[in-house]
Design a protein with these regions (language model features):
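Amphipathic alpha-helical packing elements
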Residues: 3, 14-71
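Extended, charged low-complexity segments
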Residues: 139-171
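Structural motif
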Residues: 102-108, 127-133, 153-158
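C-terminal structured domains
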Residues: 115-118, 156-158
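Long, charge-patterned amphipathic interaction tracts in eukaryotic proteins
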Residues: 18, 50, 55-116
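A short, well-structured beta->alpha microelement
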Residues: 124-143
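Membrane topogenic helices and adjacent juxtamembrane segments
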Residues: 1-7
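Catalytic cores and motor modules of nucleic-acid processing enzymes
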Residues: 96-97, 103-105, 134-135, 146-147, ...
């Protein structure tokens, strides 16, 4: 025996089964026309994402990304420092999708929006200690008519990760 998994199978027909499996997997993956691929690469760049991330979100949801939710923790905005750092502001300004700030805790939403013009708007985030149903309702209010699977959350704290499930967000 070779290795922990007893080595390659010696059963008759192994290479044929491997060939069939490879062909079936290849047939499942669609071949995108080059122009569609170029368009998606450009869209990923417009969103500030690498293509692999954009493609995985698009494959998971079947939709394009139309908005980002940024928690104040991810933007390093605090009650004492309401303006985000220069590098983050430049990167955020280049994103071609709706950019919504979610100030956490005692950070006023109107002040966060006013001092960070790169954000399209800022709306108070769900309380970190709020239950799942409350967080879901709050995120639905924030998103309005935009379906959750077209929105990406950029968070920094473990409790913020639960907002993805609560709001049925793309990631």
């Amino acid at each position: 025996m070779i290795g922990h998994n007893r080595g390659p199978s010696m059963a008759p027909g192994e290479t044929w089964r491997r060939h069939c499996w490879t062909q079936a997997r290849t047939a499942l993956l669609p071949v995108l026309p080059i122009e569609v691929l170029r368009t998606r690469v450009r869209r990923a760049a417009d969103l500030g994402l690498d293509y692999r991330t954009y493609a995985s979100v698009r494959a998971q949801t079947g939709h394009d990304v139309v908005a980002f939710l940024f928690s104040s923790n991810a933007l390093r905005v605090t009650a004492l420092q309401l303006r985000m750092a220069g590098a983050a502001a430049v990167k955020l300004a280049a994103v071609r999708a709706e950019r919504i700030g979610l100030p956490v805790g005692r950070i006023p939403a109107d002040a966060m929006a006013a001092l960070n013009p790169e954000l399209d708007r800022a709306v108070a985030a769900p309380a970190l200690w709020a239950g799942f149903a409350v967080a879901r309702q709050r995120l639905r209010e924030v998103l309005g008519h935009v379906p959750g699977d077209r929105v990406i959350l950029v968070g920094d704290q473990p409790l913020e990760a639960e907002w993805c499930a609560a709001g049925r967000l793309a990631g």
